[in-house]
Amino acid sequence: MLDFVILHTNDLHGKLSQQAAEIIAREKNSCDTCILLDAGDAIPSGNIYWRPWGEPILCRMADIGYDAMVMGNREFHFLAAGLESKVKLARFPVLSANIRCTKRSICSCIVPTVTFCIAGLSVAVLGLTVPMITKQMLAAKISPFWFEDPISAAKDIVPSLRDNADIIIALTHIGLRTDMELAAAVSGIDIVVGGHSHSLLSEPVWVDDTAIVQAGYWGHYLGKTELTISSAGKRTVHTSLIDLRD
């Protein structure tokens, strides 16, 4: 029997108290078979302004031990310099599989997927971001970036991930309703760790065989999703919320 744990936050908006950071780090360090993920909008900046020196909360998250995050709408910027500045202090992968750019080199700071080996399991994490610019928008004429529909992007990528991964996690910043549409449209995703809608889910939302989880907003809670795989291959999911408030 194998136990695999996903610790997750979303929509921090720059709010990560010292107490919250200590609890998250303690939970991460107490488990040898876990990953710590963030489902986007960790930073406080909006879509126009950016700090040239970077976002300090990403340094704190790296110090805590975050393994990856998905780019939320707050991490995105329509200029290449802005996007790079926003995420440059993250010492962990920042994901989005549905961002597109005129030259790959200008969004090399964003990767579509990352794979971890945990307790002998291959765990693939796929990032999906709410589309901020589409090709039909006027903004696409001045920005080097545009976004593909996240569900279409997942349909293209998940089958190839399934060939090599034991577990597939969609780390999304698209909102609960679209998470449910994603799970219904794309088979092979085990767990959706979501953000954007600020949904506080005390239990997973199930769509077919896919569990959807989300942990509210502003660092009030840490989500804990425990996946148990029996020797016969049967999988069970248990979720809980850890209160991080002062």
Where do the PLM segments sit?
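Acidic, metal/ion-coordinating pockets
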Residues: M1-D246
